[in-house]
């Protein structure tokens, strides 16, 4: 009987998520039979999300791509035929070689995002460097605006160990919905609330995390920076600040103090459309508990004013001295883990063109650049779902001579490909994972062989590299020996066998972030006034508030036709666009609309509605709810056009943040009408 019992292996989820959960995986007869949280993990302590529970459905589901495919018919129609790996690689080799000779290596756009975290995906650069160059993108879809803003202000992006939230007396969630996007931090929030902590929620809607909130504030979309400056004004005016901390550990306070005088409560209330008594209430809560934890989410930094907004919000923690102490602090992400080094990198070629911002991928590719983009290699990404203005992106991609996509599924992006290469799942290759919700480094173990003819990208590049005659020493096999070399090259004080059993935490890790009160800024202090903001980004060194684009004040002509602000947030059953096609997790696409807005348009609950603007349109099911204010419609991001016939990025514009080259998805006006 013992021989038939499944073996239990430990691994880590590599998805682009705060969790980076440690997993216990049962494997029997070469197949995964069950996935659960590792009960001995210091982070998730046995907890995993609904997506993690459904990993076997992803690995073995009928949607999985198993063989190389070649397009037949027109691009985008999703019609393919099965071909061999030799045929696929030969077609790719000949076309890439021809394009390199005719236009130069920069004619190939290599596009890679963060479907999986980890270090071994750097094998791609070992190939493209030997190719002689390529075109790449810069900026981000997710958090680049906030990361840059916090680095400019504090010198590092880090926060206390999440369990320290249980010591908090006051917790403020600002544009954050951890019940859906960070269940481990939510666990500790709930424990703090059960012990008597007050919970305040600031969001454009009533989210799933705020069910126990003592106070809800719903600002007009994009006005969070104004609200933060108004709160700062009141904290200073009412002396709810830590003068000693400010004097010793901050720079530019006097200039900041003058700035916030321009944000009296009446003006802030009018701008944010938050009733004055509610703003006064949050001041009173902070007065009662000036040492508080402020958890800032991704949502506030998806506007064109994102960087200055995050700077303003983060500085509220500095005003009351809520930095470097237990039970308080500013939480965005925790980047204390040391960088993992890829020791197999060939010399970097000169002909790398880093010229296209991710936020403007479509128009950036469409611009008259020399040489023009003629081919696109896409892995770990689904831009036809995840990037803005996908109708334009589709038109641009249709002009390309070659599109290669490596993926597990027939995504909207894969449907655009000439050649699809079937990729390995996280259980089918080795990797080292660092996350951003905690600072542990964990070994991702290989537990099963890839099904069909699926391969990890390292093997794809190795096979293609052979055809080009590249040095394969720079394209190592995915093996324990490769992982050991990465560990040694990264100066980690651990061994492979040890990593199989437990996560690694670097000795420099701070359980209480900034507990030493050292800040890696030019002034060695927290910077209210940051000269680098002006030098790098050409923006005001102080975190001033500017109205974002595409709203009723900055775009009255657009607003007159499309008067509803569309906000898209992340769901509990999808990871960006991943898991959208898994049958058990599928849902009918919907949109929240306030009953007042619905009534004026003759829309009833559950009816089909057309959501549209000048960029595109789609049909969703209307859900009438008071959880969104009039003038706002809300839904969750990640539906595929090929599966759900509903891709929200048909509607979004190519807007970029003030700082950090972030993508401003939330600057999006739409109109809604009943489908007859």
Locations of regions flagged by a protein language model:
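N-terminal leader/propeptide and maturation segments of large enzyme subunits in energy/redox metabolism
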Residues: 71-82, 240-276, 447-527, 585, ...
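Phosphate/diphosphate-binding loops
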Residues: 12, 18, 392, 398-402, ...
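N-terminal export/assembly segments and adjacent metallocofactor-ligating motifs
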Residues: 1-238, 267, 275, 369, ...
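Active-site phosphate/pyrophosphate-binding segments
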Residues: 231, 250-361
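Long, contiguous, secondary-structure-rich segments that constitute the structural scaffold
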Residues: 451, 456-502, 577-591, 596-676
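Acidic/polar loop patches that form or flank catalytic/metal-binding clefts of enzymes
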Residues: 33, 136, 242-243, 279, ...
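Short beta-alpha connecting loops at secondary-structure transitions
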Residues: 211-219, 439-450, 584
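Extended redox/cofactor-interaction regions of prokaryotic respiratory oxidoreductases
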Residues: 122-190, 195-202, 209, 225-229, ...
């Amino acid at each position: 009987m013992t021989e038939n019992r499944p073996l239990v292996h430990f691994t880590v989820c590599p998805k682009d998520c705060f969790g980076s959960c440690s997993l216990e995986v049962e494997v029997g007869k070469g197949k995964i039979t069950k996935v659960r949280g590792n009960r001995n993990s210091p982070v998730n302590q046995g907890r995993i999300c609904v997506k993690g529970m459904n990993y076997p459905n992803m690995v073995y589901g009928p949607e999985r791509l198993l063989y190389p495919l070649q397009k037949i018919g027109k691009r985008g129609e999703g019609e393919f035929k099965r071909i061999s790996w030799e045929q696929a690689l030969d077609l790719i080799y000949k076309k890439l070689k021809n394009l390199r000779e005719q236009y130069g290596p920069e004619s190939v756009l290599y596009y890679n995002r963060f479907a999986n975290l980890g270090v071994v995906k750097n094998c791609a650069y070992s190939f493209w460097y030997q190719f002689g160059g390529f075109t790449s993108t810069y900026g981000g879809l997710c958090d680049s605006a906030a990361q840059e803003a916090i680095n400019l202000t504090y010198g590092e992006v880090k926060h206390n160990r999440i369990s320290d939230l249980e010591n908090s007396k006051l917790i403020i969630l600002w544009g954050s919905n951890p019940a859906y996007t960070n269940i481990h931090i939510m666990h500790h929030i709930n424990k703090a609330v059960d012990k008597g902590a007050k919970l305040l929620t600031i969001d454009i809607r009533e989210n799933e995390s705020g069910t126990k909130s003592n106070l809800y504030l719903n600002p007009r979309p994009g006005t969070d920076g104004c609200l933060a400056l108004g709160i700062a004004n009141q904290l200073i005016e009412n002396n709810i600040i830590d003068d000693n901390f400010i004097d010793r550990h901050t720079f530019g306070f006097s200039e900041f103090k003058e700035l916030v005088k321009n944000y009296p409560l009446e003006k802030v209330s009018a701008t944010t459309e938050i009733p004055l008594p509610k703003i006064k209430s949050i001041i009173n809560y902070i007065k009662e508990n000036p040492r508080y934890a402020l958890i800032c989410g991704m949502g506030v930094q998806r506007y064109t004013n994102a960087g200055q907004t995050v700077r303003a919000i983060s500085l509220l923690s500095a005003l009351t001295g809520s930095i470097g102490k237990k039970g308080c602090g500013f939480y965005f992400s925790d980047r204390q883990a040391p960088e993992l080094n890829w020791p197999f990198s060939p010399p970097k070629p000169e002909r790398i063109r880093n010229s296209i911002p991710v936020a403007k991928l479509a128009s950036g590719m469409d611009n008259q650049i020399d040489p023009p983009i003629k081919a696109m290699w896409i892995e770990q990404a689904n831009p036809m779902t995840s990037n803005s203005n996908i109708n334009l992106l589709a038109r641009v991609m249709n002009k390309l001579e070659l599109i290669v996509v490596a993926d597990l599924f027939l995504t909207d992006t894969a449907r655009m490909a000439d050649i699809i290469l079937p990729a390995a799942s996280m259980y089918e290759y080795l990797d080292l994972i660092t996350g951003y919700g905690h600072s542990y480094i964990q070994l991702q173990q290989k537990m099963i062989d890839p099904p069909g003819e699926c391969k990890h990208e390292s093997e794809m590049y190795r096979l293609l590299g052979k055809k080009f005659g590249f040095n394969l020493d720079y394209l190592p096999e995915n093996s324990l020996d490769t992982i050991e070399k990465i560990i040694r090259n990264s100066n980690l004080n651990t061994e492979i066998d040890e990593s199989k059993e437990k996560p690694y935490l670097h000795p420099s890790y701070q359980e209480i972030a900034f507990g030493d009160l050292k800040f890696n800024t030019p002034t060695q202090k927290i910077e209210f006034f940051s000269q680098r903001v002006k030098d790098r980004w050409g923006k005001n060194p102080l975190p001033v508030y500017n109205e974002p684009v595409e709203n009723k004040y900055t775009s009255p002509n657009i607003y007159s036709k499309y008067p509803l602000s569309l906000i898209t947030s992340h769901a509990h059953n999808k990871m960006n666009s991943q898991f959208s096609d898994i049958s058990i997790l599928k849902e009918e696409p919907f949109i929240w609309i306030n009953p007042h807005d619905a009534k004026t348009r003759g829309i009833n609950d559950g009816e089909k509605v057309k959501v549209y603007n000048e960029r595109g349109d789609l049909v969703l099911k209307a859900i009438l709810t008071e959880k969104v204010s009039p003038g706002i419609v809300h839904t969750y991001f990640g539906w595929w056009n090929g599966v759900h016939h509903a891709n929200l990025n048909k509607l979004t514009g190519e807007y970029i943040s003030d700082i950090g080259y972030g993508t401003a998805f939330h600057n999006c006006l739409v109109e809604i009408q009943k489908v007859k």
